[in-house]
UniProtKB/Swiss-Prot annotation:
It is an enzyme of class 5 (isomerase). It comes from Escherichia coli O6:H1 (strain CFT073 / ATCC 700928 / UPEC). This is tRNA pseudouridine synthase C. Its EC number is 5.4.99.26. The active site is at residue 54.
């Protein structure tokens, strides 16, 4: 069962878990766990995608309950009328607030995109980012005697493939758990010492004008146990009040300290 964050006669939003595909492609024909099919079975009606989240990313996924609703939502996304807010845990201390305007070349998959044009130049890509908190943990990673992490809020203003992951890597603050654009040594350390076994990127909120009622709509997605455990260990509880789960209790020895 997926957590339904919002539902009316036109729209449905769910909290997509990390590791789930939004829908099957010909590359993933045998995939057992797919968001669209699960939601369809859960609510008893077809759903229509309007945007995507990468497989390892969790958070708000908004769909239409008719092809018209899906089309109108997709149009809003394409015209940048929907505000997206993400949170990430990154390598190092990213403390400033700024806008990164750094074009990105199209990232093609060797198999899925084998017929796509390869001569496209870099496309505009803009991300607003804001450092929320930092921590230094007494765990050696590589040649450093301690490990530094940062909690970052991200608002993409464009929608390039892997934009947030690539922009943070460009800033030299890759997202923890990013196997493609990240720091593999940091990824291993985060998984081993702090249970960060996934890409630490969460789609926390979508804000939009409802395409049928015209009312403002803000949808928030709660954080999973991996995220909540990280916030507890790093002393960051209370920083994401709209997304933290009140019922979560950190395992013994994991509230801002390392268990022996």
């Amino acid at each position: 069962m997926l957590e339904i964050l919002y539902q009316d006669e036109w729209l449905v939003a769910v909290n997509k878990p990390s590791g789930w595909l939004v829908h099957r492609s010909w590359l993933d024909r045998d995939e057992k766990v797919v968001v669209m099919q699960t939601v369809r079975d859960q609510i008893g009606q077809h759903v229509f995608t309007a945007h995507r989240l990468d497989r390892p990313t969790s958070g708000v996924l908004l769909m239409g309950l008719s092809s018209e609703a899906g089309r109108l939502l997709a149009q809003q996304f394409e015209q940048h009328q929907i505000q997206k807010r993400y949170h990430a845990i990154v390598r190092g201390w990213l403390m400033e607030e700024a806008v990164l305007d750094y074009p990105l070349a199209e990232e093609l998959d060797k198999i899925a995109d084998k017929f796509a044009r390869e001569d496209k130049g870099p496309q505009p890509a803009v991300t607003h980012y804001r450092g929320l908190a930092t921590v230094e943990m007494p765990v050696a990673t590589g040649r450093y005697p301690t490990t530094r992490y940062g909690l970052v809020e991200l608002e993409p203003k464009t929608g390039r493939k892997h934009q947030l992951r690539r922009h943070l890597a460009h800033l030299r603050h890759p997202i923890i758990g990013d196997s493609k654009h990240g720091d593999l040594r940091q990824n291993r350390s985060g998984a081993e010492h702090f249970g960060l076994q996934r890409l630490m990127l969460h789609a926390s909120q979508l804000s939009l004008t409802h395409p049928f009622t015209g009312e403002p709509l803000a949808i928030h997605a709660g954080l999973d146990d991996t995220w909540m455990q990280a916030l507890s260990q790093f002393g960051w509880r209370g920083l994401l009040p709209e997304n933290e789960r009140v019922e979560f209790s950190a395992p013994s020895g994991q509230d801002g300290e390392i268990s022996s």
